[in-house]
């Protein structure tokens, strides 16, 4: 019986879920807006809210705790140095979920999860590996 179980399994093992949400947290902090399925967005929201609260409290131990959760030192730095000061006067509710229709292939409910008062210039920046091109040609 699954009485009292709060979180969704999302048809993944525990390790897969933990890794997936770590990657999604890093992507959300990096781009400040991501598109995913609605159940994943609903599961991601409390994780990100707790990370922002850690960032607001500050301190080395909490920074290490955030690194252990997210596994991306650069995004933890952004979390503590950029996002935490931005939300210092807000008590929770740092993210919003906007329903975004249904995916074409499998009709899965899609959603946009984004930070409230987000930086619109952060979306899509550095979204993949950069290939160096020589301009000397």
From Swiss-Prot:
Subunit structure, interactors included: Part of the 50S ribosomal subunit. Contacts protein L32.
UniProt KW keywords: Ribonucleoprotein, Ribosomal protein
GO molecular function list: structural constituent of ribosome
Pfam families: Ribosomal_L17 (PF01196)
InterPro entries: Ribosomal_bL17, Ribosomal_bL17_CS, Ribosomal_bL17_sf
HAMAP family: Ribosomal_bL17 (MF_01368)
GO terms under biological process: translation
GO cellular component terms listed in the entry, alphabetical order: cytosolic large ribosomal subunit
Gene3D superfamilies: Ribosomal protein L17 (3.90.1030.10)
Listed name of the protein: Large ribosomal subunit protein bL17
Annotated family: Belongs to the bacterial ribosomal protein bL17 family.
Taxonomy, superkingdom: Bacteria
Organism: Bradyrhizobium sp. (strain ORS 278)
């Amino acid at each position: 019986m699954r009485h009292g179980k709060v979180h969704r399994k999302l048809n993944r093992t525990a390790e897969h879920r933990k890794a997936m949400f770590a990657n999604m947290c890093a992507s959300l902090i990096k781009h400040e807006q991501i598109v995913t399925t609605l159940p994943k967005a609903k599961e991601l929201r409390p994780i990100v809210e707790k990370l922002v609260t850690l960032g607001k409290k500050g301190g080395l131990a909490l920074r290490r705790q955030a690194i252990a959760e997210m596994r991306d030192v650069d995004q933890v730095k952004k979390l503590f140095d950029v996002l935490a000061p931005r939300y210092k006067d807000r008590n929770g509710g740092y993210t919003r979920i906007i329903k975004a229709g249904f995916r074409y292939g499998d009709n899965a409910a899609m959603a946009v999860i984004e930070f409230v008062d987000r930086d619109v210039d952060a979306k899509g920046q550095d979204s993949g590996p950069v290939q160096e091109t020589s301009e000397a040609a």
